[in-house]
Design a protein with these regions (language model features):
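Short sequence/structural segments immediately N-terminal
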Residues: 4-5, 19-75, 88, 284, ...
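A detector of repeated loop/turn-to-beta-strand junctions in beta-rich toroidal repeat architectures
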Residues: 42, 88, 130, 172-174, ...
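Surface loop/turn motifs at the tips and blade-to-blade linkers of beta-strand repeat domains
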Residues: 62-65, 104-108, 146-150, 188-191, ...
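Periplasmic c-type cytochrome electron-transfer domains
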Residues: 66, 71, 209, 214, ...
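Residue-level detector of Asp-centered blade-edge/turn motifs that repeat once per structural unit
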Residues: 76-77, 118-120, 160-161, 202-203, ...
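Short loop/turn segments that connect beta-strands within beta-propeller blades
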Residues: 95-99, 137-141, 179-183, 231-235, ...
Length: 678
């Protein structure tokens, strides 16, 4: 009897376990199908519950601390190469004879560029996420001074006499000019939108500053990106040259004679329905040229070919003899070599009308492209040796520097910077994000529309059932892992759905990512994309008087007349901390005649100041316009009773909102404080 009871208990226990397992298996299959939007994804628990860990022991075990070389500079004698290791917050020093790293200097957060004085004894490094420069003594390898800059310092250049230092402030769209004798900022000039690079002309008479984002433009018009020209003598902006139908002008260079100034650029076709991708009607890539003669003609030429695109051109350098230009294409892991004499001949024989035609001509590059040189993953900054014989290439996602012989146009060496040898899942995802290999003929990658994993400020006319409807304003990808759903219409409940089959159908026009690649891409998006610190509007967390008043407006429950505001129409209902989104759908009265009836997912507000334009279709150029132009009926929060000063204060508060981590630990206390203030 006891034996039978034991058998019964054993089999009963097994039956219960089996039933539990069967039910759990059914649930897990349903869960995976829901997350991925496919029926056969071999997703396992590790994909979502290990690879996407941001903090803790698991995150430390599965991730690595990579270097990610970004920009380069050479000592005047060419014996030492200085490498900005962006992810390591370090400046690496490489012996160019032995091709070994010989020193490492800790610098500030998110370093961008380095420049070396002609005596080879002093360097300056821009720390983009710290709003300062480090002055470094290259003998002692010590930081000897810190200079406060504008917001987001990027490229730094010396005036030809080295008396002044020009700093491109990328986030505040300015150029800071420092007197190097007094170490003080003496001027700050307005540049284009999101400037990143600058270069002096060979005669030292002027500097040009490139920009990445379009200027504010009338709604529904093509992008217009500024190249700012600064007069060196007066240190004033003397001209603002506008490149139409172009953006992401990352870097620029002058020929030694000064006859040409050349910038990298991308020509987006964002206003055309994306139904002719094979003809380049999505993105084309090339260069912008300004002639010193011919009344300063401005020309755009492509580096693409009819059946192959060379996406995301980043840096450009020109040989000392002025015969060749080298361009790094970070989206396809290629260096393009251009014959500048062929460029000159083409310009000399062509009218402006003909050159305008060439700006969209995919075949014209055959005339001036000499060679394509493959590199490691994600080539970024370039620098030529003083004699022009060697080109150094920062392979950002390889943690290496490629060395190319500029005479044979072959890679002759690879400098290992001693980064981790293991490629993590998230690192592979970052490579995929920055590579165009999954789109039709390599025409664009995730980075193209999401530079710095953010957004490009453009509105796209994506292919759909009805052409020209449901225009989409590009959304940021920063810190979005915890705030589904995705897309403005909230159709995708997970990043797997967002970047899976639906993504390939609408955007890439090729096979969808395989399962391992999709796992990797999701891991990177969830764990590897952070918000920059909001040093411009909220550097310490202590709000200004105007921001405090705006905070009260944001959390108010009654109008100025004392009338209670319905809960569903209070700002904080749809935009509660820490992400300032409730992740729910809402109608805010902003549908246009070209939109299908739909609700919209409440967007996050972290670092909202750097995400213009606003609304689902980008129709609001500024935060103010959300209420001054697009809220007549108080459907997007009650605002029509507000005084102008109150609106100004509200906007100031919105600009102060920073990363969600500052609000996560005290959401309830945060709400309680607001209720008490009200």
């Amino acid at each position: 009897m006891k034996r039978n009871k034991k058998i019964f208990l054993v089999f009963g226990g097994l039956a219960i376990i089996s039933l539990f397992f069967i039910q759990f298996h059914k649930w897990s299959v349903h869960h995976v199908n829901y997350i991925t939007a496919v029926d056969d994804h071999p997703l396992n628990c590790m994909s979502c519950h290990l690879y996407i860990q941001k903090d803790g022991i698991a995150a430390k075990l599965i991730n690595e601390d990579y270097l990610s070389p970004y920009n380069l500079s050479l000592a005047p004698d060419g014996k030492k190469l200085y490498v900005i290791a962006q992810d390591a917050n370090a400046l690496l020093i490489v012996d160019t004879k032995t091709n070994k790293v010989i020193d490492k200097i800790e610098v500030g957060e998110k370093p961008h560029s380095v420049v070396i004085k002609n005596d080879g004894e002093t360097a300056f490094v821009s720390n983009q996420w710290a709003d300062n420069l480090y002055e470094i003594d290259l003998t002692s390898l010590k930081v000897i001074d810190t200079l406060k800059t504008g917001s987001g310092p990027a490229e730094i250049i010396f005036s030809p006499d080295e008396k002044f230092l020009y700093v491109v402030d990328s986030y505040s769209s300015e150029v800071s000019i420092f007197n190097l004798q007094t170490k003080t900022e003496i001027k700050r000039l307005m540049a284009g939108n999101n400037p990143v690079a600058a270069v002096f002309s060979p005669d030292g008479s002027q500097a040009i500053v490139t920009s990445r984002r379009t200027l504010p433009i009338p709604y529904g018009t093509p992008p217009m990106t500024e190249l700012t020209v600064i007069d060196a003598a007066s240190q004033r902006v003397k001209e603002r040259k506008i490149f139409e139908n172009a953006y992401l002008m990352e870097n620029a260079a002058f020929t030694p004679s000064g006859d040409l100034a050349i910038s990298t650029l991308i020509r987006p076709k964002n206003l055309i329905p994306s139904v002719q991708v094979e003809r380049g009607w999505m993105m084309t890539h090339g260069i912008g040229i300004i002639e010193s003669g011919n009344e300063g003609r401005m020309i755009q030429l492509l580096t693409d070919e009819p059946n192959s695109y060379y996406s995301d051109p980043f840096d450009i350098v020109i040989s000392p003899d002025g015969q060749k230009a080298f361009i790094s294409h970070s989206g396809v892991d290629i260096i393009t070599v251009i014959d500048l004499n062929e460029i000159r001949a083409l310009l000399a024989e062509s009218t402006q009308e003909k050159l305008d035609y060439y700006s969209n001509h995919l075949g014209i590059s055959a005339r001036y492209v000499i060679k394509r040189i493959p590199t490691g993953a994600n080539p970024k900054g370039l620098v030529l040796s003083p004699d022009g014989k060697y080109l150094y290439v920062a392979e950002r996602l390889e943690d290496k520097i490629a060395v190319i012989n500029t005479e044979t146009l072959e890679t002759i060496n690879s400098i290992d910077l001693n980064g981790p040898s293991r490629i993590t899942v998230a690192r592979q995802g970052r490579r995929l994000f920055n590579n165009s290999g999954h789109t039709f003929q390599n025409q664009y990658g995730c980075y193209t529309c999401h530079p710095d994993s953010h957004e490009d400020g453009l509105v796209y006319n994506m292919a759909g059932a009805d052409m020209g409807r449901n225009l989409a304003n590009t959304q940021t990808l920063r810190d979005i892992g915890d705030i589904p759903p995705y897309k403005w219409n909230g159709k995708n409940s997970s990043i797997y759905k967002q970047d899976g089959m639906r993504f390939s159908t609408i955007l890439t026009r090729t096979e969808s990512f395989n399962y391992d690649d999709l796992d990797a891409l999701v891991a990177y998006i969830v764990t590897g994309i952070k918000n920059p610190p909001n040093l411009r509007y909220n550097p310490t967390g202590e709000l200004t008087a105007a921001q405090k008043r705006g905070k009260k407006v944001f959390y108010r429950t009654h109008t100025n007349c004392g009338k209670e505001i319905p809960v569903e129409n209070q700002c904080a209902t749809c935009h509660p901390p820490p992400y300032f989104t409730n992740m729910q759908m809402a109608d805010v009265g902003t549908l246009s005649d070209t939109d299908d009836p739909m609700l919209f997912d409440a967007p996050q507000l972290n670092n909202i100041y750097e995400s213009a334009p606003y609304l689902h279709d980008g129709s609001a150029a500024t935060l103010e316009e959300l209420w001054t132009k697009f809220n007549d009926d108080d459907e997007h929060g009650v605002a029509n009773d507000m005084l102008k000063d109150q609106l100004n204060d509200l906007v100031e508060y919105l600009k102060s909102i920073r990363d969600a981590k500052y609000y996560k630990d005290d959401v309830e206390e945060y709400k309680a404080d607001i209720n008490q203030e009200n």
